[in-house]
Every structure is written in C-alpha cells, then in structure tokens.
C-alpha cells in the first residue's frame, strides 16, 4: 500500500451548543481517516502555541498520525464556531490564526520525499507546492470544495492526479465542468454530491456512486472522509468505482457521530 501525507489546514471546530471542541480541518481530517485503513499518514501544518494547538497535536498523535511536522508557531490556532441545525453543520466565525502565513520549508519538502501520495485543500495555502510535488512523481490530490469560481481550476489542475470538489447535485452544467477540468490536465475529477452520492469523470466515462443510507448525526467531515477512503482504496489497487464505494462507506461511518472524528 502506498504512503500518504497531507499538507495545509487544520482547525479546531468549537460547538457552543455542545460545549465541546473537536480537532479538524481538511488536511488533519483526511490524515486521521486514512488510519482506518492501516495507513500511518504524515501531516504538515501549523498550530499556535495555545491550548488548542496542544490539543490538536495530542489528538493527531493519539490517532496514529505522524506529527513530527506539525509545527508550533507563536500565535493562535485556527478555529471555527459551528452550530447544528437539524443535524447539519452551519459555520460561524472563523479565525485563521497562524495558518494565515503557512508555507512549506525546504526541510518539509525533503520530508515529503518518503511519501507516495500528497493531499491538500483550498483552505490550506498549499497550492504552490503542487507543481514541484507532481514533477517529483508524487500522486497528487487536491480538494477545491464548492469554490467553482476559484482560479485554481485554471492554474492547478495540470498538476493534479485527483481533483476533488463538491456540488449539490449532478446536472449537465456540472458534467461539462468536469470534462473541462480533465481536459486541462487533471487525471480524474471527483465531485461529492451530499445526499446525492458522488460522480467522477476520468476522461473516458462518468462513474456514479450512490450514498449509503444511515442515520445522520453530524455531517462534519463527510467530504474529507470520502477523500480518505477513496485515496486509500486507490493506493491499495482498487478500481475507480471501488475506491468511490470505499470513500462513500468511510463518509457514512463519520456522519453517524458528532464532530469530524
């Protein structure tokens, strides 16, 4: 099985209604969810020298993630206020903290040499690393979320093996966008559709995966779970539809409890 590292964003999700705080963020979540499949992932991110930063590092270590490159910087750890409305999450105030200045060092790049797959997301200030990582032979994955107007769709996709995004539902406009993304150089584009499952375009055909029917407690981390399950499946030699099915199963597991993990 291939090795995987994530780079970029972390965030402590604070639920005032529950009087609880959960470690999260795309790079953090994807790394943690990969441990469900026997992978010991690495993560490069920045946390503040505050209690939330300490909590996040402890939480990651306890889940089996290599935190040797979770760097502590002077300042505040990124945090988001989250409210639950009918078991769906609604994001409130966001404080980016030390992550606002995140960048990879030369030592970080050297450390990434041991990993086969590198994943990041649009919030992580990591996109500038991907041309170099892709040129070095890494299998690259990036989540642009629902930011369909982002300039990254023009500049980043030639350096991606897997481009992830989200949308409410499948329609002709979405299919045309997906075809254009692969035409610009991405290997595969995969779009999660919430309760409508997911769809992928590999340059030859569309692949669709229905959601699993489970009792939804909290949708936090669903998309990140899908990405982790998918990438772990692909790294183990699964076909595209098999990896999508594993991503769906991973997401179904996550949405049945509060918090990302």
Swiss-Prot record:
Pathway: Carbohydrate metabolism; fructoselysine degradation; D-glucose 6-phosphate and lysine from fructoselysine: step 1/2. The keyword Nucleotide-binding applies. Coiled coil: none annotated. Pfam families: PfkB. Disulfide bonds: none annotated. Keywords: ATP-binding, Kinase, Nucleotide-binding, Transferase. Belongs to the carbohydrate kinase PfkB family. This is Fructoselysine 6-kinase. It comes from Escherichia coli O157:H7. The lineage of its organism: Bacteria, Pseudomonadati, Pseudomonadota, Gammaproteobacteria, Enterobacterales. The gene is frlD.
């Amino acid at each position: 099985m291939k090795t995987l590292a994530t780079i970029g964003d972390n965030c402590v999700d604070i639920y005032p209604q529950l009087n609880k705080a959960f470690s999260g963020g795309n790079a953090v979540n994807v790394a943690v969810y990969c441990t469900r499949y026997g992978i010991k992932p690495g993560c490069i991110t920045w946390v503040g020298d505050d209690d939330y930063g300490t909590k996040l590092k402890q939480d990651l270590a306890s889940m089996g993630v290599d935190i040797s490159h979770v760097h502590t910087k002077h300042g505040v750890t990124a945090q988001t206020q989250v409210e639950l409305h009918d078991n769906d999450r609604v994001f409130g105030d966001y404080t980016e903290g030390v992550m606002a200045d995140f960048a990879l060092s030369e030592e970080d790049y050297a450390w990434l040499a041991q990993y086969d797959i590198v994943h990041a997301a649009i919030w992580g200030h990591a996109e500038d690393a991907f041309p170099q990582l892709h040129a070095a032979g890494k299998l690259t994955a990036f989540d642009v979320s629902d930011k369909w107007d982002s300039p990254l769709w023009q500049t980043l996709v030639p350096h991606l093996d897997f481009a992830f995004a989200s949308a409410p539902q499948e329609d002709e406009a979405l299919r045309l966008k997906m075809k254009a993304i692969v035409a610009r150089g991405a290997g595969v584009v995969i779009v999660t559709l919430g309760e409508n499952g997911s769809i992928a375009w590999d340059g030859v055909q569309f692949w669709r995966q229905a959601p699993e029917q489970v009792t939804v407690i909290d949708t936090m981390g669903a998309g990140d779970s899908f990405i982790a399950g998918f990438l772990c499946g692909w790294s183990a030699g699964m076909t595209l539809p098999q990896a999508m099915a594993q991503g769906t199963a991973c997401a179904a597991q996550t949405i049945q409890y509060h918090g990302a993990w």
